[in-house]
Regions:
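Intrinsically disordered, low-complexity regions enriched in polar/acidic and amide residues
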Residues: 7, 21, 408-409
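Bacterial N-terminal signal peptides
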Residues: 10-19
Length: 506
């Protein structure tokens, strides 16, 4: 929302799918362990997605949703899926706070286990996401009180052991849990590497113990922690913290950590850190793509997180400093953050997905991969209301007809199909695409995207059409949501405070 029947496997696509983030000799995992699936946030599935024609089961992700008029301004945590098809669901339990994590059978939705967490939200405008992560397919890591992380074993079993870890030392937390709970909070989804180390942004409030300042934390598999303040990581005393909801990303070899930071006014940097030490390796000031003398903005009301491409390039969505109908920009950098490349024409609350180029059969360019992004043109911010999804070529350019800026070339776009009666002065206006990270299936050459008309669509990247759809709800304006693909090909989407498991039906 603007701020204001299975397919046959395709052999070529299989090869493409495996090459995005996995060595050719490795059998790709079938799970969906975190936000954007992997630590690079590619959102590329390794199983064949089912056609979205039928709701198999559903479950609430909010037991007390609070509506602002007809809108729902809550970012719900991404569902996760284990290799054995347990779906992990983050549930908001109270009107203003309170959370629990559920494990449900992917085939039936039956509840397997419930794990409470003492995590409490920070002060906020839109409700930020709470994002657990599966580490090494064996344990579930959950945000807890006071900047701690809860580690639950055996995520596919009804029972599992739970231990708490603190990046500043569990003995310190145990000595004064109330003070830490009041002054230190995890404020981003958790990101785990292949060794089981976990990374996240945290925010401090008031006078936190141990001299803790808002920044970036790392916990090893054994629970040993380290941290760096946002100020020190950026080398800029004006910097405050990591934006709420912005999950750190890792390079393909896991050695580099990418994270955004901002000052109180919302301007800031994208940083690259050593993932072992959190030492600074580089930074880039985030600038407006139309006027690079002005700073772009980062919002606590979004979930934009860095995406790392198969070649190591880094993409990050920001808000604009110059008018472009509140679309923002998808900024593009090399792995060292020393070279600024052609931006995409949309960045607000969006984490781009990676699309292997041959999945788009009409594409005739030279890039090995493309980007999938939201591409709304908000009628409420001066746009036409022709809200689209887009496949972009990050290495080709065009002139943006909205802003006049040089942006990534559009390869394929599709407009929402449902007219938007809220904008009678814009006769072409359609309901917004409601997605912050979209599941991509190279095996069927498809992407799965939510819309504020209450439907989940399969975008066929061969025909360019919205080939399949299923009604989830009557539709609502809401904070953007993720889609994922489970190990059996079930599609999962959130709409109006409910998680839906979708397939082709009986």
């Amino acid at each position: 929302m603007a701020l204001g029947t299975r397919f046959p496997a395709i052999a070529v696509a299989v090869t493409l799918c495996l090459s995005v983030t996995h060595p050719a000799s490795a059998r790709p995992p079938r799970d969906w362990p975190g936000y954007g699936r992997d630590p690079q946030h590619s959102a590329v599935a390794t199983v064949t997605g089912r056609r979205p024609l039928h709701v198999r089961w559903s479950t609430p992700v909010d037991l007390a949703p609070q509506y602002w008029g007809t809108s729902l301004l809550v970012h719900y945590g991404s569902p996760l899926a284990t290799r054995r098809n347990t779906v992990v669901v983050t549930v908001k339990t109270g009107a203003t706070d309170g959370f629990r994590i559920e494990g449900r059978r992917g085939d039936t939705g039956a509840l397997v286990w419930t794990e409470p967490t003492d995590y409490a939200l920070p002060p906020h405008n839109w409700v930020p996401s709470v994002g657990p992560v599966l580490a090494r397919g064996r344990v579930l890591l959950i945000p807890g009180a006071g900047g701690t992380v809860l580690r639950r074993s055996r995520p596919d079993r009804a029972t599992g052991s739970v231990r708490r870890y603190a990046f500043y030392g569990i003995a310190s937390y145990d000595a004064d849990p109330a003070t830490f709970a009041a002054t230190v909070k995890v404020t981003t989804p958790l990101t785990a590497d292949r060794r089981g180390n976990v990374f996240f942004g945290f925010t401090t409030f008031g006078s936190a113990p141990l001299g803790l300042q808002s920044g970036i934390a790392r916990l090893s598999r054994s629970g040993r922690g380290t941290w760096v303040s946002a100020v020190a990581a950026a080398g800029d005393p004006s910097i405050w913290k990591v934006p709420y909801g912005s999950a750190p990303a890792l390079s393909l070899d896991g050695r580099r950590l990418y994270v955004a930071v901002h000052d109180p006014s919302g301007t800031g940097y994208l940083l690259v850190l050593d993932s072992a030490t959190l030492g600074s390796l580089g930074r880039v000031r985030l600038l407006d793509a139309k006027d690079p003398t002005r700073f772009a903005r980062l919002s606590d009301d979004g979930t934009a997180s860095p995406t790392v491409g198969p070649d190591g390039d880094v993409y990050f969505g920001v808000l604009p400093a110059t008018p472009n109908h509140f679309r923002g920009w998808m900024l593009h950098f090399d792995a060292d953050l020393t070279v600024t490349k052609t931006p995409g024409g949309f960045g607000w609350d969006d984490t781009p997905s990676i699309v292997p180029a041959p999945a788009v059969t009409s594409y005739a360019g030279t890039s090995s991969y493309l980007l999938l992004t939201k591409y709304n043109d908000y009628a409420g911010a001066g746009g036409t209301g022709v809200n689209r999804m887009a496949i972009l070529d990050p290495f080709a350019s065009m002139i943006d007809p909205i802003s006049g800026a040089t942006v990534m070339q559009e390869v394929l776009t599709v407009a929402g199909p449902t007219p938007d009666a809220d904008f009678p002065g814009n006769p072409l206006a359609v309901r917004e695409w409601c997605i912050n990270t979209a599941a991509v299936d190279p095996l069927t050459r498809s992407a799965f995207v939510n819309n504020e008309d209450g439907k989940l669509y399969r975008w066929d990247l061969v025909t360019g059409t919205l080939a399949d759809q299923v009604v989830l709800t009557p539709g609502i304006g809401e904070a953007y949501t993720p889609t994922i693909i489970g190990p059996d090909g079930t599609i999962y989407a959130i709409n109006d405070a409910t998680l839906f498991a979708v397939d082709e039906g009986p």
